[in-house]
Amino acid sequence: MVMSATAALDVAKDLIGESQAARRELDEVDRFLAFDNPVDVVARKAHVSPDHEKNALARFSHTPLLQLVVSEVAQQMVLEGIDAGADDVSAAMWRPFEVNGLVSRQYALWHATVGYGEAHVMVLPGDTVYPDEPGRAKAWMSAFSPRALFASWNDPVEDAFPAFALRTIGQPGKKSVYRLYDDEAVYFLAQDDTANRGLSFIQYREHNMGVCPVVSFQNDMDLEGRTPGDVEKFKIPAQRHDKTVYDRMLAQHYNSWKVRTATGLEAPNSDEDAAAQKFKLAHDDILTGEGDVKFGTLPETQLTGFIQAADADRDMLAAVSQTPVWALNGGQLVNLSADALVEARSMQRLKVGQKQRANGRSIAKAARLASFAEGRYEDAENFNVTARWADVESRSLAQVADALGKIVTMLGVPPALVLDMIPGVTPAKAEEWREFMRANPSETERLSATLNRQLTYGTNV
């Protein structure tokens, strides 16, 4: 049943407060994911009265390691298709992802999921139809950051869809536009604080989806329903690294050279005389003294300890985030066997695989919801849908060809079935090759077909 205007306003007011509280936490995370520099916060906490020079050093000391930790995972999560049984069914369920541009924008979806802890995809019936299916409307799908779309759950662990979703659309000035979603309709609301109008109800539109049309993608949901992002989990080790680099920058800026001293010199009679003597000194002058005059030097601060401490902090971040250390330090691996290289990346593969499994269910839900929006109700009831991820493991084409060739020759797997396993070959290209193979069978296949006909119908065939 569609909510009344009063009920929609009451729900929206509660969700606006909750979403703003969540937004403040996400804004702090966004400082590490966006181009803003969060290190000045560390500097202000570490020093009571920082000056402009130290603030500049704090900005220089920031290394965006958390951006790299998140991006390094998101870049390996490449969704290239859906398996739903028959090829035509799989193609139909994958088509909404393609026509809505989610295939090309999936990196942003995974980046938000891993970085913030969750992201959302909204699915609604569209206004346009497929050119080859005039009677079928396209499903509309779009990905949203949790900063723009807030999902409210009755039970985030057990429920497949949220109870409500609130989309915030910023406007110039102190104005905001909201869209509230439930399992029946979308409610349009607006707020204008400049005119003291508060929150007002505009209209509603039924979407006929039967559920709140939002699919959530979680990073690491536990049994308590918590979904921390990688920034939240690894922020402390990253800040520790920035603090160590900042200390090194201070020592490098103020104490990285020898200080020459002279004692026993006759002091100038006035400040003017002292300034005049300094003005007369040149860089290559040699000073001498008599009597009790002594010259010496104060050693510079050694930076080796700071550099080693920063390396240790970086390595600790790599360990706790299951990130290969060479991905953070730019180092090169040399003199390692193929098996050693595979083992060196094993923890990272486990991490990426876990996130792929966790989000595979959400991909299947989005595919079924899009099928329902397009009127393909049988596909919407297909619970055998699985996500097909691209193999991004670094291998040479010769290694892949050798492995697939052995699968075909030793196990008797038809060559047409392994085309999708070739890196870089899209499902469309693999299908094109299969059609060519069916239209142009090999000599062995033609001979086998002839022999089968002779065995079936006799030698006169």
Placement of each model-derived feature along the sequence:
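A glycine-biased, small/acidic residue-tolerant capping/turn segment at secondary-structure junctions
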Residues: 365-387, 430-434
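Extended, regular secondary-structure scaffolds
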Residues: 115, 120-228
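Extended, charged amphipathic alpha-helical segments
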Residues: 200-343, 384-387, 392
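Extended, helix-rich architectural segments
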Residues: 1-140, 460-461
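Extended hydrophobic-aromatic, low-complexity segments
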Residues: 326-329, 397-398, 415-419, 428-432
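Extended, non-catalytic structural segments that build the interaction scaffolds
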Residues: 30, 37-51, 55, 285-320, ...
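Glycine- and charge-rich intrinsically disordered segments
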Residues: 1, 242, 249, 253, ...
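Long, highly charged low-complexity segments enriched in Glu/Asp and Lys/Arg with interspersed Ser/Thr
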Residues: 422-455
